[in-house]
């Protein structure tokens, strides 16, 4: 059975379509179809109803939508009052502070102890009260005079000197000597070969 789509509805083309519209039907036995002619009492194929009105969609109740609109119009929304009741920027700051506190207590101050930062450190700004075993080594600043002396004699070194810190003294020295050679670069002009 062939079908066509017209304005969102599905129309089935068959021999009974003309009878439903009130037009003359083709005489029995003279049509192109091999089907039997419909009976006059309605027991044949002509009494069958079309299926185009069956849909899977539920129909909306117009009264229900109008009552919800009235409820929405009746309520006044005060955006300033809503903003006063809940300040979202404070929530974000608090979440970030909690994340920093957990990272700070886990990795920096307590280093593996299962205590909260608020329990381990009474005040956040008072870091000097922390035990020496839980704090990192302090770095010493090298005066500029000593630093320039190290740079002047660096070309004579065969390997890097041992650092003052105990962390770097365990590293193996380089087997190759350090060479500080000056390198000069020259720009070549492209030759036009065409």
From Swiss-Prot:
Matches recorded under InterPro entries: Patronus
Quick one: where's region Disordered? Answer: 28-48
Signal peptide start-end: none
Q: In which tissues is it expressed?
A: Expressed in somatic and reproductive tissues.
Induction comment: Constitutive expression with no clear cell-cycle regulation.
Where can the motif D-box be found?
48-50
Picking any one GO biological process from the record gives:
maintenance of meiotic sister chromatid cohesion
Function noted in UniProt: Not required for protection of centromeric cohesion.
General remark? Patronus is Latin for protector.
Give the protein's recorded name: Protein PATRONUS 2
Name of the gene = PANS2
